[in-house]
A protein has these predicted regions:
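A short, glycine/Asx- and small/polar-enriched loop/turn
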Residues: 49-52
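Conserved short beta-strand edge segments in small beta-sheet-based binding/regulatory domains
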Residues: 75-87
C-alpha cells in the first residue's frame, strides 16, 4: 500500500460532527474496504471561520480507493496527495 495525505478543509461544524464522521470512516474502511484502505491518523485544524478541517494520513492501494472510501463514508476529499517519502525528526506528540 502507498501512503497518502488527504486534505478536508472546513468540513465539520464542531467536534461532535467530526466524531460522527470518524466513526463512519472507520466503519467503511474496516467493514467494506478491508485491505484496500487503512486510516493511520488525522490532524484536526481549526479553520478561520470556526469550522474544523483535517489533514488525514492513509494507506491505500491507490488514490481511486481513497476517493471511493470518501464517497461511501460521505466525506469530502479536497485534495489527495501521494507521499513520496517521510522524514522523521521527532516522534509525533
Amino acid at each position: 500500500m502507498q501512503t497518502f495525505v488527504i486534505m478536508r478543509r472546513g468540513a465539520w461544524e464542531d467536534a461532535s460532527d467530526l466524531e460522527d464522521a470518524a466513526a463512519e470512516s472507520t466503519r467503511v474502511a474496516d467493514d467494506e474496504m478491508p485491505g484496500q484502505v487503512r486510516w493511520i491518523r488525522s490532524y484536526v485544524l481549526e479553520e478561520e471561520d470556526g469550522t474544523l478541517g483535517t489533514v488525514c494520513i492513509y494507506q491505500a492501494e491507490d488514490a481511486d480507493a481513497l476517493m471511493e472510501h470518501a464517497q461511501r463514508a460521505g466525506l469530502p476529499s479536497d485534495e489527495i496527495l501521494p507521499v513520496a517519502n517521510t522524514v522523521i525528526v521527532r516522534d509525533d506528540p
